[in-house]
Amino acid sequence: MKTPRRRAREFAVQGIYQWQLNALTPATIEKNLRDNEQFAKADEALFRTLLYGVLNDPVRIESAIASHFERAPEDVSPVERAVLLMAAFELTQQAETPLAVIINEAIEIAKTFGGAEGHRFVNGVLDKYAAEVRPEEFEAVRSHRRNKRPAADKPVATDKPAAAE
């Protein structure tokens, strides 16, 4: 089941996508998206923050993340670009939302709307950007993940008895 915040992010990505293709005003995009019956289930405040926040200065946001692209900016699909713009805005402007949540949501949205491997590109770009804009939180998350992994040199417990040599 999708949360209201996930729905808000999905609608924001759809709005940013529409803006890229049709150069519509944010108000027109919002009106069009509100016609979708699922919009009522979205977190409206988050949707508006993301849509209007990104479309207020998309050039600045894209220039901040473009250095982390492993391809030319014009080769980034409109869906991937929309997801990246939304998540980059959220990483810098929504400090109360954990970076792991922002990145995971972006990956899932890229899987839903993007191409077969688009989510990997989104993950890579956002990982690098998060390390830049939220270095302390990024290191804490990274350290936590490292500590959760079993060490390669430690034996892993199994239900099978050890084989006799």
Curated annotation (Swiss-Prot):
Species of origin: Laribacter hongkongensis (strain HLHK9)
Region (Disordered): 139-165
GO terms of molecular function: RNA binding
Similarity comment: family membership: Belongs to the NusB family.
Protein known as: Transcription antitermination protein NusB
Source taxon at top rank: Bacteria
Gene Ontology annotations for the cellular component aspect, listed alphabetically: cytosol
Gene3D superfamilies: NusB-like (1.10.940.10)
RNA-binding listed as a keyword: yes
Function comment: Involved in transcription antitermination. Required for transcription of ribosomal RNA (rRNA) genes. Binds specifically to the boxA antiterminator sequence of the ribosomal RNA (rrn) operons.
